[in-house]
């Protein structure tokens, strides 16, 4: 009986002493459902559209591993219909700021990503993405080098779905419409 306790204690100490995995810090956030806002196409006046589910962000996950920031978010409904869906992902770090524009529209529903700096100039950054319409999810991998080898990052996410008469927008961290992107708390890189 005593040998089992000693064995369990030794195993516990060994597990604690092992180096951490390469997953880094993970931050999850649940966005309130039914907080989409709408504006007539060509207008910048937004009003609540609680019945709109397409483009409604409901959960985000940010993981800062050794070599990359992994971003995944889920929507109530994401479909390859209408005039397109457009996503803005902002990244602020202790080194650099980057904005990723991920646009998917008729004929290009797989989407294309462009990364810009604070002066809205395109920068060479090999961001990879995947839009999964069946699971209503979007995932991105941002190499750490794009952020100047940052030690922490804050992420903001906004989705816009364009219809023929209205555009619907949701910010992952704001309840309702916000004129500027709302960023989450710092996510630290794995040492």
What are these model-derived regions, one by one?
Residues 1-24:
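Secretory targeting and sorting signals
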Residues 115-148:
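Acidic, glycine-rich flexible loop segments
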């Amino acid at each position: 009986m005593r040998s089992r306790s000693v064995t369990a204690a030794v195993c516990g100490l060994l597990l604690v002493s092992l180096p951490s995995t390469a997953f880094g810090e993970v931050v999850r956030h649940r966005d309130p459902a039914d907080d989409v806002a709408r504006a007539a196409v060509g207008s910048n006046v937004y009003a609540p559209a609680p019945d709109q589910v397409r483009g409604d962000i409901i959960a985000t996950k940010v993981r800062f591993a050794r070599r990359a920031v992994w971003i995944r978010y889920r929507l109530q409904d994401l479909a390859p219909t209408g005039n397109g869906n457009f996503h803005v992902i902002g990244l602020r770090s202790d080194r650099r700021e980057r904005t990723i524009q991920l646009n998917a529209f008729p004929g290009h529903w797989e989407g294309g990503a462009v990364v810009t700096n604070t002066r809205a100039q395109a920068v060479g950054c090999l961001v990879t993405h995947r839009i999964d319409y069946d699971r209503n999810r979007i995932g991105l991998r941002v190499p750490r080098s794009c952020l100047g080898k940052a030690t922490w990052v804050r992420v903001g996410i906004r989705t816009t779905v364009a219809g023929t008469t209205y555009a619907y927008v949701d910010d992952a961290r704001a309840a309702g419409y916000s004129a500027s992107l709302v960023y989450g708390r710092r996510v630290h890189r794995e040492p």
